[in-house]
Curated annotation (Swiss-Prot):
It comes from Ralstonia nicotianae (strain ATCC BAA-1114 / GMI1000) (Ralstonia solanacearum). It is found in: Cytoplasm. Belongs to the class-I aminoacyl-tRNA synthetase family. This is Leucine--tRNA ligase. InterPro entries: aa-tRNA-synth_I_CS (IPR001412), aa-tRNA-synth_Ia (IPR002300), Leu-tRNA-ligase (IPR002302), Leu_tRNA-synth_edit (IPR025709), M/V/L/I-tRNA-synth_anticd-bd (IPR013155), Rossmann-like_a/b/a_fold (IPR014729), tRNAsynth_Ia_anticodon-bd (IPR009080), Val/Leu/Ile-tRNA-synth_edit (IPR009008).
Length: 877
């Protein structure tokens, strides 16, 4: 055993041992020593995109997973920790454009490097289950399930709006549109309607909402999904009109439909707004060039809800009116840039007095504002919006004719009944959730398995011809989809009539790939999409990933699971029983501004920081030139802020165990972790201390493995065992709560106790170090494995990987004596030691005889002795 701790040598030794044993290969129905089935536990981190290198967020995520699985394996569970690659997507195409290399080659090179990095971290991954979503063996089943959904009517085709770059002749993702222009060409982006494929996720809206309740997920994530699904109960009703369309017939059968959750405010309607694509807008624009130009401007705007919420609300009158269904009054119709044709009926009612958006719109354009809700004691005015204007809990109706005096619920019921009686409306439940458009006009993704035939129309690819393989040697040039120009892929034969035909060139949304990869881990070599092994492992016991995936990925995965259930492929309703969303990793930022005032971000490694006598930063300079830089504050590690830490450099300098220890100790898993170079140094020092303690006591520990453990022959033994088992009990509790930062804290207390127990015997010390190594092992597996082997524990207990988790000895926790604070006349004057089972009289007698009592009571006999059990004695003299 080497005297000095060398992380690289220790970690190489441990990893070679695990590799030789194939230590992490897992099978179903593993048996315990007594022949019984081990309970299964499946925990999985969200699979990474193979961007090229791991970042510290990856390190934290996977270490959390690894700690959990190693500890549960020691507790007798059959654990599964797999890994794969979310390998399709736009970044690979962008890299291909920049570097002139095929996305496939770029992706596979990145996978190889990142896999090597993960292995250097010592992660207990079963690599035999590795999955890459760009593999035909994987995406074949994306295609197969799509065809099944097409058969069932869950998948369907309709036109959808996309961002079109007229110069590059390609569709752009929303994030590729910057200030209304294409990110590469700079061209003004157009909106185009093209045929696309959709999945009916809305058919599952109520189930997706209801099934959130029992999940062991953070309430914040549940709320985000609830809001995204967006169940609204209200009234859908019509404003009658006689506006004709191009064919001379009345548009929409003479009814402009809207939906509202505030039917109680219907008497306050002073305008209606329609989407730019609405037939009424198109009709009004025919003789109105200004309106036509405004509509064209709206069509070039974003269709993202987030953008709609923050952009300036604009409108223009159509000169047309519709009829209020209850008053018969004429209501002007406007075109509004904030109204989406894809949401509801493409029209909204405007009630400026009781909707903040409508209030601002009406004030901007001089529209009428009519109060119809009143809250007692609150004056109404049109100059500035007040929160109570929208209060449906305290408000009652005014200026509303027969509805005056009704509260919210009464008014909604009455209005809905009157509208229904006229055949103009009814109560309805609507959903914010929209069907999932999965068509992407991109190359690097799962090909949609359809064929276009001039004679037969759209024809599904026969099941036996799956997968439709994506050519992996194409290099995008930025002008359109490469698949549409590749004859090898495009040209085919119609499976129905045998005539020449063309393949569909759209590929699937990459969220499809991440919908079910965790099930493929259970049966990666399966001849079917999933098999009986999936029934064993699923549903997953613990899912781990970032809060940024709280909505789309998790929602789509839940939907996909329910579709698979309905197709008879799985037997469960929800894929993830518990969810842990780990906090972001933060670091300081530094920058200088260039001549144009643009910030040039500088990596923290290139900066010297000056601090005051309390360690607080007071300035910073660039190492290269010694000149000042601006301290920008603490932010999430990112490429854009250039404040990332390279995990590989950290591992090369300090070792993987130090990286793991710091990321677990610095903060609870669900909270943000602020990077600290001093914290990394501290983690490294702690591991050196643990190693040095093992070296110092190696001989006595190796010699004592045949001895049994007793409750200690001396007071020092008993004190050490009491401390260790007390801390072990707390560590067990913290492991169960996934509070790994306090687990590390417990291990530090154990080492402190061992180092401080100079008078303890070898047996107590041997037992104590054995407990410490097992408690610490899930966090820092390399150093603990080598110490376990070198100090002879493996011979006594077996390898650390499957060593039994240490049991708390309740007998060791029992104290024969306790220390009580001693007060004289209410002031602390020392302490006394009494038997743990001493009664009040015995404690009083011991206190009365104490020398401190005699000294501070000046020889006076006690008038009264107050005993607070387990805490203190107060002698009143």
């Amino acid at each position: 055993m080497q005297d000095k701790y060398s992380p690289s040598e220790v970690e190489q030794q441990a990893q070679q041992h695990w590799q030789a044993q194939d230590a992490y290969r897992v099978t179903e129905h593993a048996r315990a020593a007594d022949g019984s089935d081990k309970p299964k536990f499946y925990a999985c981190s969200m699979l990474p995109y193979p961007s090229g290198k791991l970042h510290m967020g990856h390190v934290r995520n996977y270490t959390i997973n690894d700690v959990m699985m190693r500890q549960l394996r020691m507790k007798g569970y059959n654990v599964l920790m797999p890994m794969g690659w979310d390998a399709f997507g736009m970044p690979a195409e962008n890299a291909a454009l920049n570097n002139g290399v095929a996305p496939a080659a770029w992706t596979y090179d990145n996978i190889a490097y990142m896999k090597k990095q993960m292995q250097s971290m010592g992660l207990a991954i079963d690599w035999s289950r590795e999955v890459a979503t760009c593999s035909p063996d994987y995406y074949k089943w994306n295609q197969w399930l799509f065809l099944k959904m097409l058969e069932k009517g869950i998948a369907y085709r309709k036109t959808g709006t996309v961002n079109w770059d007229p110069i590059d002749q390609t569709v752009l993702a929303n994030e590729q549109v910057i200030d209304g222009r294409g990110w590469r060409s700079g061209a003004v982006v157009e909106k185009r309607e093209i045929p696309m494929y959709y999945l009916r996720i809305t058919d599952y809206a109520q189930e997706l909402l209801s099934d959130l309740d029992p999940l062991g997920w953070p309430e914040r994530v549940k709320l985000m999904q609830q809001n995204w699904i967006g169940k609204s109960e209200g009234v859908r009703f019509a404003f009658p009109h006689g506006i004709p369309g191009d064919d001379g017939k009345v548009i929409g059968d003479g009814k402009l439909y809207v939906f509202t959750t505030r039917a109680d405010t219907i008497m306050g309607v002073t305008f209606c707004a329609v989407a730019a694509e609405h037939p009424i807008a198109a009709h009004a624009a025919q003789g109105n060039p200004a309106l036509a130009a405004f509509i064209d401007e709206c069509k070039h705007g974003s269709v993202m809800e987030a953008d709609m919420a923050t952009m300036e609300k604009k409108g223009m009158p159509t000169g047309l009116t519709v009829t209020h269904p209850l008053t018969g009054e004429a209501v002007p119709v406007w075109v509004g840039n904030y109204v989406l044709m894809t949401y509801g009926d493409g029209a909204v009612m405007g009630v400026p007095a009781h909707d903040e958006r409508d209030f601002a719109f009406a004030n901007k354009y001089g529209l009428a504002i009519k109060q119809v809700i009143d809250v007692k004691g609150q004056p109404f005015g049109t100059e500035a919006w007040q929160e109570w204007y929208a209060d449906k809990e305290r408000g009652v109706l005014v200026h509303s004719g027969k509805y005056d005096g009704l509260d919210y619920r009464q008014a909604v019921d009455a209005v809905a009944a009157d509208l229904a009686a006229q055949g103009l409306g009814e109560k309805k439940t609507t959903w914010r959730l929209r069907d999932w458009g999965i068509s992407r006009q991109r190359y690097w993704g799962t090909p949609i398995p359809l064929i276009h035939c001039d004679s037969c129309g759209v024809v599904p690819v026969p099941e036996q011809d799956l997968p439709v393989r994506l050519p992996e040697d194409l290099v995008p040039d930025g002008s359109g989809n490469p698949l549409a120009k590749d004859a090898r892929f495009l040209e085919c034969t119609c499976p129905s009539c045998g005539k020449p035909a063309r393949r569909e060139t759209d590929t699937m949304d990459t969220f499809i790939d991440s919908c079910w990869y965790y099930m493929r881990y259970t049966c990666p070599d399966g001849a079917t999409m999933v098999d009986g092994r999936n029934d064993y492992w699923m549903p997953m016991d613990q899912y781990i990933g970032g809060i940024e995936h709280a909505i789309l990925h998790l929602l789509y995965a839940r939907f996909w699971t329910k579709v698979m259930r309905d197709l008879g492929l799985v037997k469960f309703d929800e894929p993830f029983t518990k969810l842990l969303t780990q906090g972001m990793v933060l670091n300081e930022t530094y920058y200088r501004e260039d001549a144009a005032g643009k910030k040039q971000w500088i990596n923290p490694a290139d900066v010297d920081v000056q601090t005051d006598d309390r360690g607080r930063p007071i300035g910073a300079t660039l190492k290269a030139d010694g000149q000042p830089v601006v301290i920008g504050g603490v932010e999430k590690m990112s490429k854009s802020k250039n404040n990332g830490i390279d995990p590989q450099a950290l591992i090369d300098q300090y070792g993987a165990d130090t990286a793991r220890l710091f990321t677990m100790f610095a903060a609870p898993p669900e909270q943000q972790l602020e990077w600290s170079d001093a914290g990394v140094e501290g983690a490294s020092r702690f591991l050196r201390r643990a190693w040095n303690f093992g070296v110092a006591h190696a001989e006595s520990i190796r010699a004592g493995h045949g001895n049994g453990v007793v409750n200690g022959a001396t007071d020092a033994d008993r004190a050490l065992r009491r401390e260790l088992h007390t801390v072990l009990k707390q560590a067990n509790y913290d492991y169960e709560r996934l509070q790994y930062n306090t687990v590390v804290s417990a291990a530090m207390k154990m080492l402190n106790a061992l180092e401080g127990a100079k008078d303890a015997g070898a047996d107590a010390r041997r037992e104590g170090l054995g407990i410490l190594l097992r408690v610490l092992y899930p966090v820092v597996p390399h150093i603990t494995h080598v110490l376990w082997q070198e100090l002879g524990y493996a011979g006594a207990y077996g390898g650390l990987l499957d060593a039994p988790w240490p049991q708390v000895d309740e007998g060791a926790l029992v104290q024969s004596e306790i220390e009580l604070v001693l007060q004289v006349n209410g002031k602390v004057r020392g302490s006394i030691v009494v038997p743990a089972d001493a009664d009040r009289a015995a404690i009083e007698a011991i206190a009365a005889k104490d020398e401190a009592v005699h000294r501070f009571a000046e020889g006076k006999p006690p008038k009264k002795i107050i005993v607070v059990p387990g805490r203190l004695v107060n002698v009143v003299a």
